[in-house]
Amino acid sequence: SNKKNYQKEIVDKHNALRRSVK
């Protein structure tokens, strides 16, 4: 029921991946 939290988690994962690549 927390779609915002879900999206935030996805963004966090994406950011972590980008940081890893960088």
UniProtKB/Swiss-Prot annotation:
It comes from Pseudechis colletti (Collett's snake). GO terms for cellular component: extracellular region. One of its GO terms (molecular function) is toxin activity. Expressed by the venom gland. Belongs to the CRISP family. Residues 1-22 are annotated as: Disordered. This is Cysteine-rich venom protein collettin-a. Keywords: Disulfide bond, Secreted, Toxin. Contains 8 disulfide bonds. Residues 1-15 have a biased composition (Basic and acidic residues). It is found in: Secreted. Disulfide bonds: none annotated.
